[in-house]
Amino acid sequence: MEHGLRSIPAWTLDKFIEDYLLPDTTFGADVKSAVNVVCDFLKERCFQGAAHPVRVSKVVKGGSSGKGTTLKGKSDADLVVFLNNLTSFEDQLNRRGEFIKEIKKQLYEVQHERRFRVKFEVQSSWWPNARSLSFKLSAPHLHQEVEFDVLPAFDVLGHVNTSSKPDPRIYAILIEECTSLGKDGEFSTCFTELQRNFLKQRPTKLKSLIRLVKHWYQLCKEKLGKPLPPQYALELLTVFAWEQGNGCYEFNTAQGFRTVLELVINYQHLRIYWTKYYDFQHQEVSKYLHRQLRKARPVILDPADPTGNVAGGNPEGWRRLAEEADVWLWYPCFIKKDGSRVSSWDVPTVVPVPFEQVEENWTCILL
C-alpha cells in the first residue's frame, strides 16, 4: 500500500482513502460489539469482589475508535474507567496500579465461567504502577481479535456538558498538581471525553484527511523507526490546517494533505493551541498558558489538557519526519491532471497570544 500512496495521482486520493483506509461495516460492528462486552464487564462485574467497595462512574471510549478516525484493519480501542474511589490527580498516579491489578485478576477469573463466551489474552507489564492494562478479546461472534487498553482515571469532569467549557478551577487544580509533581501531560486520560468530542463532531471529509495523514505517519514509522513525534500531534496538526486554511465540509484532499506536510516541514515555527475548553480568563490558567507558549518550539497544546505539549521534547523526531515530508512533496500524489503541482492552503504556523497582565500593571505581548 506504501507504493500505492507514493505513486497515485492527486485526483485519486479520495478513492484511495475509500478503498484502503475506511473501515468496513463488519469491522465497525465487531469493534462496537467487543467494546460493549468490555464496558459491561467493567461496570457491572469487575469490582464486585474487591476488598473495598469500588464504584465505576463511567467508562469512556477514547483513541481512534472513540474519535471516529479508525484505520481499516486496526481493531483496537482505549477504554478509560472513571472511578469514584480516585479523588485527585495524585491519587490516580499513586493508586492506578491496584485497580489495574484487580481488573487483571477478574479477567483471569471470568475465563472459567462457561456462560461468559469470550476469551481475554492479557499482555504482561513489567511496570508495577503501569498506566494501563492491555489485552486482546476474542469471541465466537467476532471476525477478528480486538485489542484493548484500559486506563483507570480520576473523574474530575463529572458530567460533561458539550455546550460549555469546564469550570476553569479544574484546570487550575490540574496545573497546580502537575507543577508540584513534575508530571505535565500525565493526566490527559482524565480529559478523554473532551479529546474525543474535539474530533468526533468534525466533518466526515476532515476525518478522512486525518486517516490519510495517519496512514502516511505509519509508513514513515515503518521506514524511519523511532523516535518520531506522537501520532496525536499529527492529528491535531491536520485539524489546525483545515480550520485555518479551508474550514469547509468539502475540500481538495491533496491540498489538505500537502498543507499538513508543509506544517511538519516548518515544525520549528509551530505554536498552536485552542481555547475551546480552556482560555486566558482565569488568572492562574492564563499565567501557565503564557509560560507554556513561551517554550521552545514546536508547541502544540492538547486542546483538552493545557499541561500536555504533544509536540514537545522530541526535536530529533520532528527533524527526521520533516525530512521525509519534504521528499514526499515531490511524489505523484501532489501532481494535478495538467501536470502542475498541487498548492497548499495559506496557513500560519503561529497562533497569536493575547497580552499578559503583569504585576507592575504594564502589558507585553508574546511574539
UniProtKB/Swiss-Prot annotation:
**GO cellular component term of the entry, any:** nucleus
Q: In which tissues is it expressed?
A: Expressed in oocytes and granulosa cells of ovary, in intestine, stomach, spleen and uterus (at protein level). Expressed at high levels in the digestive tract and lymphoid organs. Expressed in ovary and spleen.
UniProt keywords, alphabetically: Antiviral defense, ATP-binding, Cytoplasm, Endoplasmic reticulum, Immunity, Innate immunity, Lipoprotein, Magnesium, Metal-binding, Microsome, Mitochondrion, Nucleotide-binding, Nucleotidyltransferase, Nucleus, Prenylation, RNA-binding, Transferase
EC no. given is 2.7.7.84
What broad class of enzyme is this? transferase
Reply yes or no: does the keyword Transferase apply. yes
Q: Name one GO molecular function term.
A: 2'-5'-oligoadenylate synthetase activity
Reaction(s) catalyzed by this protein? 3 ATP = 5'-triphosphoadenylyl-(2'->5')-adenylyl-(2'->5')-adenosine + 2 diphosphate
- Does the keyword Metal-binding feature in the UniProt annotation? yes
Subcellular localization is given as: Cytoplasm; Mitochondrion; Nucleus; Microsome
Cofactor requirements of the protein: Mg(2+)
In terms of Gene3D superfamilies, this protein maps to:
2'-5'-oligoadenylate synthetase 1, domain 2, Beta Polymerase, domain 2
Question: Annotated region Interaction with dsRNA: where?
Answer: 14-61, 201-211
Residues that, per the record, bind Mg(2+): 76, 78, 149
What is the activity regulation entry?
Produced as a latent enzyme which is activated by dsRNA generated during the course of viral infection. The dsRNA activator must be at least 15 nucleotides long, and no modification of the 2'-hydroxyl group is tolerated. ssRNA or dsDNA do not act as activators.
Give a single Pfam family match.
Answer: NTP_transf_2
Residues annotated as binding ATP are 64, 211, 214, 231
Post-translational events: C-terminal prenylated.
Instruction: Provide the lipid-modification sites (S-geranylgeranyl cysteine).
Output: 364
Any Gene Ontology biological process: negative regulation of viral process
Q: What induces it?
A: Up-regulated in response to the type I interferon IFNB1, in a STAT1 and STAT2-dependent manner. Induced by polyinosinic:polycytidylic acid (poly I:C).
Query: Hey, which family's this protein in?
Result: Belongs to the 2-5A synthase family.
Report quaternary structure and partners.
Answer: Monomer. Homotetramer. Interacts with OAS1D; the interaction inhibits OAS1A catalytic activity.
Q: Its function?
A: Interferon-induced, dsRNA-activated antiviral enzyme which plays a critical role in cellular innate antiviral response. In addition, it may also play a role in other cellular processes such as apoptosis, cell growth, differentiation and gene regulation. Synthesizes higher oligomers of 2'-5'-oligoadenylates (2-5A) from ATP which then bind to the inactive monomeric form of ribonuclease L (RNase L) leading to its dimerization and subsequent activation.
Q: What is this protein called?
A: 2'-5'-oligoadenylate synthase 1A
Q: What is the native source organism of this protein?
A: Mus musculus (Mouse)
Could you read off the lineage of the organism from its UniProt record? Answer: Eukaryota, Metazoa, Chordata, Craniata, Vertebrata
